[in-house]
Curated annotation (Swiss-Prot):
One of its GO terms (molecular function) is structural constituent of ribosome. Belongs to the bacterial ribosomal protein bL33 family. The lineage of its organism: Eukaryota, Rhodophyta, Bangiophyceae, Cyanidiales, Cyanidiaceae. Signal peptide: none annotated. The gene is rpl33. This is Large ribosomal subunit protein bL33c. It comes from Cyanidioschyzon merolae (strain NIES-3377 / 10D).
Amino acid sequence: MAKSKSSRVGISLECTACRANANQPGVNRYRTTKNKKNTPNRLELKKFCPYCGHHTIHREIK
């Protein structure tokens, strides 16, 4: 049987504080999935960033 087309897609979340601060050693990214039907807009989650050392907002990137 053929597999049905899934509405879940893989996305990357990037730390906004690391991106704005140029003197950081790197940029933190998380990989997760989301359901395109339920959340069509870009996802924003508050997650821990090891480069910043505290919880920051992570936004979805392409």
